[in-house]
Amino acid sequence: MRQSQSFIPTLREVPADAEVKSHQLLLRAGFIRQSASGVYTFLPLGQRVLQKVEAIIREEMNRAGAIELLMPALQPAELWQQSGRWYSYGPELMRLKDRHERDFALGPTHEEIITALVRDEVKTYKRLPLTLYQIQVKFRDEKRPRFGLLRGREFIMKDAYSFHTSQESLDETYNKMYEAYSNIFRRCGLNFRAVIADSGAIGGKDTHEFMVLSEIGEDTIAYSDASDYAANIEMAPVITTYEKSDEPLRKLEKVHTPGQKTIEEVASYLQVTPEKCIKSLLFKVDDRYVLVLVRGDHEANDVKVKNLFDASVVELATPEETKQAMNCEVGSLGPIGVSESVTIVADHAVKAIVNGVCGANEEGYHYIGVNPERDFTISEYADLRFIQEGDPSPDGKGTIRFARGIEVGHVFKLGTRYSKAMNATYLDENGRSQTMIMGCYGIGVSRLVAAIAEQFADENGLVWPASVAPFHVHLISVNAKNEEQRQLADEWYEKLGQAGFEVLYDDRPERAGVKFADSDLIGIPIRVTVGKRANEGIVEIKVRQTGESMEVSVDELIDTIRRLLQQ
């Protein structure tokens, strides 16, 4: 492609509203433009990268035995009502009515559509297992779209869905998809981790997220420093054991703590460590109140609370709800003298607290000399806290470290979550009706483009891996007015194309400095510069990733480029 005939609107200045590196560079290098908040146009360079990423995904999906189709973005409310998600999904679901007042949604996912399709078309075990996938636009009404393509309101996803007659069959496909995803992200050149995760609004049980390591990641990954263990911080179990001290039990005493609200303030005021304090948090778990107790230096994990009660919705109680249930303010909560209508559960670490401190359910007062079981009853002890750096790894190997990650893929074992709700059944070998078992597997395709840009960039611009770069070679004629340079560049533009390379040829009548700056900004892996030694048949090659440059004869050009791209 000749750059003079293309559409690559580069920018010299960083756009004011672009917060992160990938967003800044994709805008500046002419890959994307914002159409509305969280909505983007892929310009020609961006479209080429998108197509490269999609091609890798298709190859790996097809290799894993998945079959491509295309489902509608506009989905009838009836299907979402059958699954129950029409009522539970929340404000992120974009809803609309047609001219006949019928309800529709712009799909954030396609579980309902695919389940209805397979339910209506597959009637016998002989047609299973079946895995179908699509690459399609999705919609989510994000409260605050940010970071460019990383969190938009319209985005492109690859979503696959598998249907099975047995758990063993699902396990086999899940493992194939897990391996396919690993191959996809490896081929994109990414530094990533597959982590144990929570299924969220999709539902289901076993699930892994594929996280690209990045300082701007919205998720925290807990990983072992001595093994391959990695999990989303919400899901990492705590295996720490706690020794209970043998100090004599003191009597329970209520003390005045004026103006002391936080654990740090109370601990300092009473001259104890946070480990001696019991932190009390009131959650609304579906339709009941639960008081969750954790040690003062720990944080309560709402996902673990949700899983403990197998709940649909878990939220911190509002100040008004706290007043209603506990008759006190949030900063004074404690487990002593609580109404029987409130369930009390505690993290394992609380069991080891001796002569501790807790709120007295009265403004400006706390209890000291607090001992669980003696002073209040706990319904159940469980792992209810977030794992922390320095905790032992759940696999027993090494200790936990934290990293930030951008989620680019997610695989789920859905089980019968959707098939049962939507009556997706088949006839087994004995002619009996059975419910299909499902899995689903998603990749954020447009988000993946941004994640690659986030990992592969330097102070001068983007540095695309060869596998997803918009072009293999950026050919630059230093002086377009010089006949020898222009002729040699024209000749090798044709020859490189014939040799199978994708070439962007900068034939613009611009200064050399502008061309080189744009080349670095765009980030094509190999730059070939035709300059002063054109009359000798000598050109300069520069590797974008390493900055390495060399002069070579044009006779060696094709072999040299091929070798460099394979490194």
From Swiss-Prot:
Transmembrane segments: none annotated. It comes from the Bacteria. PROSITE patterns: AA_TRNA_LIGASE_II. GO terms for cellular component: cytosol. Coiled coil: none annotated. It catalyses: tRNA(Pro) + L-proline + ATP = L-prolyl-tRNA(Pro) + AMP + diphosphate. Keywords: Aminoacyl-tRNA synthetase, ATP-binding, Cytoplasm, Ligase, Nucleotide-binding, Protein biosynthesis. Belongs to the class-II aminoacyl-tRNA synthetase family. ProS type 1 subfamily. Catalyzes the attachment of proline to tRNA(Pro) in a two-step reaction: proline is first activated by ATP to form Pro-AMP and then transferred to the acceptor end of tRNA(Pro). As ProRS can inadvertently accommodate and process non-cognate amino acids such as alanine and cysteine, to avoid such errors it has two additional distinct editing activities against alanine. One activity is designated as 'pretransfer' editing and involves the tRNA(Pro)-independent hydrolysis of activated Ala-AMP. PANTHER family: MITOCHONDRIAL RIBOSOME PROTEIN L39/PROLYL-TRNA LIGASE FAMILY MEMBER, PROLINE--TRNA LIGASE. This is Proline--tRNA ligase.
